Amino acid sequence: MTDNIAGKAYTIIFEEYPTYLYALVHSDKYGYDILAQFLREIADECKKRSFKQVLIEENISAVTSMTDVFRTASELPQLGFSKIRMAYVDRFADQKEMNEFGQMVAVNRGVNVKIFGSQEEADKWLSEKA
């Protein structure tokens, strides 16, 4: 399923795997509003399809601020991820430090999230505890 609602700054492609929902996010813009919007949409889709695990792969070349990452990661439980196990892959390796910061903040708020360098690594992690 591809989400192409007019006016949105991103698209999401969802694909069901045996133990998790895969969500590929494409955008050329970034920031708190975009992050919160697509993460809420992904959490809603997990609930709708009865998935307790998700692999989110970002294909977003733009960079956001540390403040936006902190705010979004802090709000992950309210966005719907309190009971969803998250694997996160960013296609842009230069954003690794920012993603690791977000992971630390989210884990400190009780979210089960882990950053990976590839979809294969994330798939292995999600599959081993399913």
Language model segments and positions:
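Amphipathic, Lys/Arg-enriched alpha-helical "gate/interface" segment within cytosolic domains
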Residues: 2-130
